[in-house]
UniProtKB/Swiss-Prot annotation:
Gene (UniProt): sw
Disordered: annotated segments: 17-52, 75-107
Subunit structure of this chain's protein: Homodimer. The cytoplasmic dynein 1 complex consists of two catalytic heavy chains (HCs) and a number of non-catalytic subunits presented by intermediate chains (ICs), light intermediate chains (LICs) and light chains (LCs).
Name of this chain's protein: Cytoplasmic dynein 1 intermediate chain
Disulfide bonds: none
Organism expressing this protein natively: Drosophila melanogaster (Fruit fly)
Biased composition (Low complexity): 75-85
Keyword match Cytoplasm: yes
Length: 663
């Protein structure tokens, strides 16, 4: 019942609001009609002669004279005035009040009045000026088109005058008399809507109505932002001179040193660039003999990397190329016996792209670094295997040059020199494989170097440990690997499975094996079983994983052969270096008795390591004095032709047949 009573009260309240709204609207209409009639009556003070002429004209046309119309309007005005002066409550309001009290609405007694009004405006007077044909802003003295002489001018002024805002004023004032919309262009405020835009909208025109005439265009001052205001208010501060202690603190801060190192590298690269602006691409600047010599040069020296402090008297022990930045090569260096105060192990990163003579990064360790490699799946990490048996990790993003992580010296890890270090796997599953000279293979994760994930003892006949000196994985292989040892034998092994450990033993060299390289050309998987070994017995041997005997032995060297490496793009090309300072390039499709190209490094230093650039157009070698040489390989020798693979397959078959005949 309370709910029903509440609904009834709300309905009664809404009905009362509607009645009150109707009453106000009717009162406003009556008041407007009174004022309009009063103004029309007041405006009747026209010249009597004109009024008389007008009445005669209307009578001749059969229209009621103006005097009769004014008298009828005055009678209506008197009636409405009487009704308004009584100030008795409206019948609708009484009905609403009674409805709220008694619950019933009384019928309304309404009456209809027919009022006939006739208004004929006089002839309009048009006034033009010589300057403009638009209404002057803000005043009515210079109007181009004026209608103030009309009897309706007072009515229009009252129509557009400001009124007190109500919830229903928009509909009452602007929409209930659509017949008067044409008078908009004759109002005094037609230009005021464009005036004082900076102070808000002051136009009296209804919403949606556009003004007529040309607007007044003025210059607008540019906007002032808070920052400009703040700058104006700021007082110029005096520069305080730093003391020597404060300067030293800034210089020794980590951020300042990092900035100096990075900015110095950029400036050094810019200053080291030596571009020949007189290069003649037509070829008229060089003689024909010089061009012929350059085109026929199989090997030509490109760069020599050497640092007076860190490279001097240090033998290069290993090299590796970055997979993220192909122009970067890292080299590991042995200790310098003449400088006992310097770190024993040094690793330097060189840039082959820019003509700068200093390394990109220099890292050092307390023990001599015997092997190093880039982290394949992280461009900032560098790994190193030390003479003490530790695996160390450097990061070029940190300021310090010492390792950020290292493996422990314990029986669970390596305790002998680590000559073999390589990362295998994929982006989401990769491991670091290391082998020490005591025949222990360890698998590491970069996230945890505190202990190896897996270990394997490499033993021959379960009795004697194998001293491994070199290691290589065949193409697309992460489980099987081939190894060279100090006793001259070649071993194949597996990391996992039922046959984990040493699987096969191949015929031996007459001396320790110094280097091993597998055929990793990706275009022909038929050659994935091939690998090369070098030894101090002055020979290079070609092997197949399918046969325990060598396929061929290259015996052209007259000194220790220290390293060998297959070309990454050519199926039949490999490089080798020896202790006499000679670099040899062998193309098995051309000759197997003598090298295709050979060169002796200036000074004939003992060459220790050789490596190809990823493009196969350059070969990099390191010597015993700490110098790293980059040689350009002729394109006709480095780049294979279309039939190189088929030719190499044919020559390989011939080599196998000759090997079987010798047996």
């Amino acid at each position: 019942m309370d709910r029903k009573a509440e609904l009834e009260r709300k309905k009664a309240k809404l009905a009362a609001l509607r009645e009150e709204k109707d009453r106000r609207r009717r009162e406003k209409e009556i008041k407007d009609m009174e004022e309009a009639a009063g103004r029309i009556g007041g405006g009747a003070g026209i010249d009597k002669d004109q009024r008389k002429d007008l009445d005669e004209m209307l009578s001749s046309l059969g229209v009621a004279p103006v005097s009769e119309v004014l008298s009828s309007l005055s009678s209506v005005n008197s009636m409405t005035s009487d009704n308004s002066n009584t100030q008795t409550p409206d019948a609708s309001l009484q009905a609403t009040v009674n409805g709220q009290s008694g619950g019933k609405k009384q019928p309304l007694n309404l009456s209809v009045y027919n009022v006939q009004a006739t208004n004929i405006p006089p002839k309009e007077t048009l006034v033009y000026t010589k300057q403009t044909q638009t209404t002057s802003t803000g005043g009515g003295n210079g109007d181009v088109l004026s209608c103030h002489s009309s009897p309706l001018s007072g009515y229009m002024e009252d129509w557009w005058r400001p009124r007190k805002a109500h919830a229903t004023d928009y509909y009452d004032e602007y929409n209930l008399n659509p017949g008067l919309e044409w008078e908009d262009e004759f109002t005094d405020d037609e230009e005021s809507s464009l005036q004082n835009l900076g102070n808000g909208f002051t136009s009296k025109l209804p919403p949606g109505y556009l003004t007529h005439g040309l607007p007044t265009v003025k210059d607008v001052a540019p906007a002032i932002t808070p920052l400009e205001i703040k700058k104006e208010t700021e007082v110029k501060k005096e520069v305080n001179e730093l003391s020597e202690e404060q300067k030293q603190m800034i210089i020794l801060s980590e951020n300042f040193q990092r900035f100096v190192v990075r900015a110095g590298r950029v400036i050094e690269r810019a200053l080291s660039e030596n571009v020949d602006i007189y290069t003649d691409y037509i070829g008229g600047g060089d003689s024909e003999e010089a061009n012929d010599e350059r085109s026929h040069a199989r090997l030509s020296l490109n760069r020599v990397f050497y640092d007076e402090r860190w490279s001097k008297n240090r033998c290069i022990t290993s090299m590796d190329w970055s997979t993220h930045f192909p122009e970067l090569v890292v080299g590991s260096y042995h200790n310098n016996e003449e400088s006992p105060n310097e770190p024993d192990g040094v690793v330097m990163v060189w840039n082959t792209k820019f003509k700068k003579s200093t390394p990109e990064d220099v890292f050092h360790c307390q023990s001599a670094v015997m092997s190093t490699c880039f982290a394949k799946f992280n461009p900032n990490l560098i790994l190193g295997g030390t003479y003490s048996g530790q695996i160390v990790l450097w990061d070029n993003r940190v300021q310090k040059r010492t390792p950020i992580q290292r493996t422990p010296l314990s029986a669970a890890a390596h305790t002998h020199p680590v000559y073999c270090l390589q990362m295998v796997g994929t982006q989401n599953a990769h491991n670091v494989i290391s082998i020490s000279s005591d025949g222990k293979l360890c698998s590491w994760s970069l996230d945890m170097l505190s202990q190896p994930q897996d270990t394997l003892e490499l033993q021959q006949r379960q009795s004697k440990a194998i001293a491994i000196t070199s290691m290589a994985f065949p193409a697309n292989e992460i489980n099987s690997l081939v190894m060279g040892s100090e006793d001259g034998y070649v071993y194949s092994a597996s990391r996992h499975g039922l046959r984990s450990g040493v699987n096969e033993v191949y015929e031996r060299h007459l001396g320790p094996i110094t280097g091993i390289s597998t055929h990793y050309n990706q275009l022909s998987p038929d050659f994935g079983h091939l690998f090369l070994t070098s030894s101090i017995d002055w020979t290079i041997k070609l092997w197949s994983l399918k046969d325990t005997k060598p396929l061929y032995s290259f015996e052209d060297n007259s000194d220790y052969v220290m390293d060998v490496a297959w070309s990454p793009v050519h199926p039949a090309l490999f490089a080798a270096v020896d202790g006499s300072g000679r670099l040899d390039l062998w193309n098995l499709n051309q000759d197997t008795e003598v090298p295709t190209a050979s060169i002796v490094v200036a000074g004939a230093p003992a060459l220790n390591r050789v490596s190809w650039t990823p493009s196969g157009l350059h070969v990099c070698i390191g010597d015993e004095a700490g110098k790293l040489y980059v040689y350009d390989v002729a394109e006709n020798l480095a780049q294979p032709s279309r039939d190189e693979w088929s030719r190499f397959n044919t020559h390989l078959s011939e080599i196998k047949m000759n090997q079987s005949d010798e047996v």
